[in-house]
Amino acid sequence: MTFAKIKFSAQIRLETGLHIGGSDAFAAIGAIDSPVIKDPITNIPIIPGSSLKGKMRTLLAKVYNEKVAEKPSDDSDILSRLFGNSKDKRFKMGRLIFRDAFLSNADELDSLGVRSYTEVKFENTIDRITAEANPRQIERAIRNSTFDFELIYEITDENENQVEEDFKVIRDGLKLLELDYLGGSGSRGYGKVAFEKLKATTVFGNYDVKTLNELLTAEV
């Protein structure tokens, strides 16, 4: 019986400010209009695993679906087996687990004199008919922040012969994410990211990851 878990790790470096929204339900008067999501313990920005998973799946659907899927449950088999499928007749647990990504270079940012791990960007929308301005404040995790990225991939008898194919899809997803954006307001310059120090490690069972590491660093 084959059973192993592979940890795929990397550093997510922000090349521009990142906005992934948090709750503003209890915002005080004069507070930021759109805060970022933060770790409730440290009050430091995080990148939710759900944001990474959703964005990567959306981008990969443009490549691996033969036609436009109205819902994720209509995705191709290769995406369904990696990300899961909740449709009753096609229900399938995904092979991937996306972890929340936490800030990893706080000390480096502190040494540069950074006073806050977020910034506030002031934006304005103008009503084209009345010319009335609608100013707003958007919070962003600052450029050059790095976050620990971790992805778990499960190998069983069912998918032992599909591992390399799956990892090529994962590699494509990361490349597409670098060429697109993460979070909101990407068309206005937010959310440009880079994945650095890519590495696959066997964390349970026995599986030789040499070929997988070669795939991860190969040009797409």
Curated annotation (Swiss-Prot):
Target ssRNase is inhibited by EDTA. Encoded in a type III-A CRISPR locus. Part of the Csm effector complex that includes at least Cas10(1), Csm2(3), Csm3(5), Csm4(1), Csm5(1) and mature crRNA. The Csm complex is elongated and slightly twisted with a maximal length of 215 Angstroms and a diameter of 75-80 Angstroms. It has been modeled to have a central protein filamant of Csm3 subunits along which the dsRNA helix of paired crRNA and target RNA binds. The filament is capped at one end by Cas10 and Csm4 and at the other end by Csm5; ssDNA is thought to bind to the N-terminal HD domain of Cas10. Coiled coil: none annotated. Keywords: Antiviral defense, Endonuclease, Hydrolase, Nuclease, RNA-binding. This is CRISPR system Cms endoribonuclease Csm3. The gene is csm3. Changing D33A: No degradation of target ssRNA by the Csm complex, complex assembles normally and binds ssRNA. 10(3) to 10(4) decreased growth of an RNA phage in vivo. No change in ssDNase activity of the ternary Csm complex. The keyword Hydrolase applies. Changing E119A: Wild-type degradation of target ssRNA by the Csm complex. It comes from Streptococcus thermophilus. Belongs to the CRISPR-associated Csm3 family.
